[in-house]
Amino acid sequence: MSELLSFALFLASVLIYAWKAGRNTWWFAATLTVLGLFVVLNITLFASDYFTGDGINDAVLYTLTNSLTGAGVSKYILPGIGIVLGLAAVFGALGWILRRRRHHPHHFGYSLLALLLALGSVDASPAFRQITELVKSQSRDGDPDFAAYYKEPSRTIPDPKLNLVYIYGESLERTYFDNEAFPDLTPELGALKNEGLDFSHTQQLPGTDYTIAGMVASQCGIPLFAPFEGNASASVSSFFPQNICLGDILKNSGYQNYFVQGANLRFAGKDVFLKSHGFDHLYGSEELKSVVADPHYRNDWGFYDDTVLDEAWKKFEELSRSGQRFSLFTLTVDTHHPDGFISRTCNRKKYDFDGKPNQSFSAVSCSQENIATFINKIKASPWFKDTVIVVSSDHLAMNNTAWKYLNKQDRNNLFFVIRGDKPQQETLAVKRNTMDNGATVLDILGGDNYLGLGRSSLSGQSMSEIFLNIKEKTLAWKPDIIRLWKFPKEMKEFTIDQQKNMIAFSGSHFRLPLLLRVSDKRVEPLPESEYSAPLRFQLADFAPRDNFVWVDRCYKMAQLWAPELALSTDWCVSQGQLGGQQIVQHVDKAIWKGKTAFKDTVIDMARYKGNVDTLKIVDNDIRYKADSFIFNVAGAPEEVKQFSGISRPESWGRWSNAQLGDEVKIEYKHPLPKKFDLVITAKAYGNNASRPIPVRVGNEEQTLVLGNEVTTTTLHFDNPTDADTLVIVPPEPVSTNEGNILGHSPRKLGIGMVEIKVVEREG
């Protein structure tokens, strides 16, 4: 209803101003600004829905001040460009319409009415309401009743008798199991769901709407609200360190806790969370690659679900035979947005909807078959009678190719339980949320029936039942939940441990690199993650007087304040204000101690603008003084005009990447010498080893042969035509996820370059 009212007010404002208000520059500018705000808000809502499937939420608020990089982002580039172009077109059209009768005399009454209607359209828009609520949630002090509802359970289960298998289905919400809406989509897992305790109304709350947040909610009974963006949790050394979570209780009760997934454990700090709360045995893509049957059988995120669930079954067998009490948690990935992935062993590889194949539905149908196969193995085993199996979604599906069809349904998260000791077949329609999952499992295992804000759906009353406005209530509790981190409010001294790549201050520890905004009563950590912008881009958003401490590789800050360190990959510490003074210190000891030293100086806005502009220079446009191209730092020597076909810097150098260009091309600002030696320090990837690699300068071509290890080769060139471009053509680029950023499409690697140097020859 509010959408219709908002649009009606917008349309009325446009028509009244265009046809009645007449000519006045001030009223035109004011009305266009407010109407433009309406357009921006609604496009933001549309774009947010596209990325999150949940409107403007905490993740979007973070992204508005940073950058969305990371998982699958390349698939969103075209929609993003479309939104920008559409916004420009709408603004242009809006300005043209409002000035249709600019030659008519100004009418104050109609101008005022049009402006008021425009303001009303903004106020009534859902986007404005969502942003207002989010901003309020950032500034609240908390809610006094939080302590009454947040309850810590007993740290042990008195007499545990059952093992636990807990399966997180990536984005595998219960909506997919509606056979009327999506016929025969989930027959195998749906049949198992109907054999157990099926909780049909598990809603999603703020702070529980992405994987690590859903895991925290289901195991600790609280949303993931933190003093930093949730997916940046990989940078912290401990996770809600004061809280008691399901894993802690299981460990204290004699359980050995295991976690198995196909993706890298470091992503979003799942390893930190699990290690902080009772899990001693973790298996992700790095740990599994040496034990799986086919280490090359991977998707963009890691190993396929069939591989992961096969390993989970092996672990279940091994642990069951040992006779020890255990919990085995596993997380699938094949149903990850935007398209999903199809395991090669499943029979259900294709699902048509609306008369055409749908990749997301196909991935769901395949993944549920793999999960069902795993569960049926457990059910057929002699150990099932001592086992509780839990299947849940980590969160509702985000914007995938099935999302518009899901949105036509009443959407809920998946949560069902199959008990080997006491078979129960029932659908429970009680209102609940993800935070109740852990408490329900704890209750079944013989522990308390509460866990944080979660309550057992078998013997307690969910917050979703107590509060009709549970989403608003959850946001009201956000400051209280953030305080559970016990995060420090000041930073005076700090220590950097180079061996561990950690910084410590005021009792807190963070992985490097790290950016901190330091004020009188608050220290705000801004880690670097797959979903956040590089730290220098985040620093560029600081105000001129904001105090900062930035710990990163020296070369990243050298272009601003320490050019002598432009080629150093050591750690450096920079601190100060962007509009004031900055210092850079080289971390030259294994354990390096520093102090914050912020001076109250006069702010220089010209200096501030220069710093911001330099921080925002993209990597490929950075230039440094050097007599060779050093590939393990960003940018290129000053003599290089541009380059292409080269991937990002890594600790050792850079790979060529045929996704960015079939050949490595380095164009210099001036012609290369008439005679020169080209000294190349490099290695080859895969089948490119021991193969002739053409290297061209102008009309002359030499051959380079590389092995799998780094070697240095000198090629002799004559350049009578004054060519200015060096071209290297890897013969057989290999598509691989090796060394890739999690969730990105595979790179096509050819050669790995450490250094290229042009040495002029006499004669």
Curated annotation (Swiss-Prot):
Pathway: Glycan metabolism; osmoregulated periplasmic glucan (OPG) biosynthesis. The keyword Methyltransferase does not apply. GO terms for biological process: glucan biosynthetic process. The chain crosses the membrane at residues 1-21, 26-46, 77-97, 108-128. Keywords: Cell inner membrane, Cell membrane, Membrane, Transferase, Transmembrane, Transmembrane helix. Its EC number is 2.7.8.20. It comes from Escherichia coli O81 (strain ED1a). Pfam families: DUF7024, Sulfatase. This is Phosphoglycerol transferase I. It is found in: Cell inner membrane. The keyword Cell membrane applies. Transfers a phosphoglycerol residue from phosphatidylglycerol to the membrane-bound nascent glucan backbones. It is a multi-pass membrane protein. Belongs to the OpgB family. InterPro entries: Alkaline_phosphatase_core_sf, DUF7024, OpgB, OpgB/LTA_synthase_biosynth, Sulfatase_N. GO terms for cellular component: plasma membrane. It catalyses: a phosphatidylglycerol + a membrane-derived-oligosaccharide D-glucose = a 1,2-diacyl-sn-glycerol + a membrane-derived-oligosaccharide 6-(glycerophospho)-D-glucose. GO terms for molecular function: phosphatidylglycerol-membrane-oligosaccharide glycerophosphotransferase activity.
